[in-house]
Swiss-Prot record:
Residue positions of the active site: Y129
Name of this protein: Oligoribonuclease
GO-annotated cellular components: cytoplasm
Sequence ranges assigned to domain Exonuclease in this UniProt record: 8-171
Sorted UniProt keywords: Cytoplasm, Exonuclease, Hydrolase, Nuclease
Source organism phylogeny: Bacteria, Pseudomonadati, Pseudomonadota, Gammaproteobacteria, Enterobacterales
The family this protein is said to belong to: Belongs to the oligoribonuclease family.
Keyword Nuclease appears in the UniProt entry: yes
UniProt-listed GO biological process terms: DNA metabolic process
Subcellular location per the Swiss-Prot or TrEMBL entry: Cytoplasm
């Protein structure tokens, strides 16, 4: 392993909802790729403990999705709160990339960053201010070359590490099939 400033940090959060003023992070996962999207390492996937009262605020979609995946039970059983999950993630990242070098990478990553800013500010500050958001390419493809979207299908498990792996694969798909290099 080597800390390389060209490596990319990919992150995904599962939350109890979409409003960081009301909802909370219930799962965090990270992985690191090189600049060519080769996966170098998978970080910890952490179920972040939240109270029963917080979990009771979830809407039907979140209850169904996160109960069906087993995440709700993992969250209830977890002993790691926001701070412990944040520190474990930072310790992993320090092995692979210096602070402030990687953009935050993922799908619709602005939403995740809002939650990081509120609940894991030290981790949020570890990223460069830029974003590498795969959903930007998806939206451009939808408008400019919609037929390309049939070539990549996501599983949509809404489990953080699975979602990150799909984001990396999706960006690689767009690199090969949409972007002229």
């Amino acid at each position: 392993m080597s800390a390389d400033e060209n490596n990319l940090i990919w992150i995904d959060l599962e939350m109890t909802g979409l409003d960081p003023e009301r909802d909370r992070i219930i799962e965090i996962a990270t992985l690191v790729t090189d600049a060519n999207l080769n996966i170098l390492a998978e970080g910890p996937t952490i179920a972040v403990h939240q109270s029963d009262a917080q979990l009771a605020l979830m809407d039907d979609w979140n209850v169904r999705t996160h109960t069906g995946s087993g995440l709700v039970e993992r969250v209830k059983a977890s002993t790691q709160g926001d701070r412990e999950a944040e520190l474990a993630t930072i310790e992993f990242l320090k092995q692979w990339i210096p602070a402030g070098k990687s953009p935050i990478c993922g799908n619709s990553i602005g939403q995740d960053r809002r939650f990081l800013f509120k609940y894991m500010p030290e981790l949020e500050a570890y990223f460069h201010y830029r974003y590498l958001d795969v959903s930007t390419l998806k939206e451009l493809a939808r408008r400019w070359k919609p037929e390309i979207l049939d070539g990549f299908k996501k599983q949509g498990t809404h489990q953080a590490m699975d979602d990150i792996r799909e984001s990396v694969a999706e960006l690689a798909f767009y690199r090969e099939n949409f972007i002229k290099l």
